[in-house]
């Protein structure tokens, strides 16, 4: 049995995002004031300008004909996760993710899933691996994914009928957020900007 990722590189301890940061961001995103909306627009603009490869990858997913709940979830989680990294590490420590790094992470995710699918007796899957690497981020993501999958009533609908959310669309959004999380995690520099530790280099 193995718990850590076989294909996914470990996230350095200095790149862990705290749960409290995400809680603060969630509260700020719930603010519907004009000032808060302006700040949100600025955050999306910074994401696009500082992480063009990542923002394009997320946009490709969100530009699909997705279920409206999955679409809203994707916009919310993508900006919340990116803001968490920005606020935690700042522009000096958070490097731009290159096209090569993005492609390598996508391949690592696919390979990790294939390796674990080939060992059906393994109790840990991709979700578990990423949760170990970024526990605060993944707990936040899972909370909102689970909430999105709950059946809900249409506004103004009579009889209490509920609408099922498209689980495949939600899963596509979730996968894009996992990719975003891992790419940003490996883009973080240590406090002193030194070369990453031997644990990551040997992974």
Q: Which role does the model predict for each range below?
A:
Residues 5-203:
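Long compositionally biased, domain-poor regions of proteins
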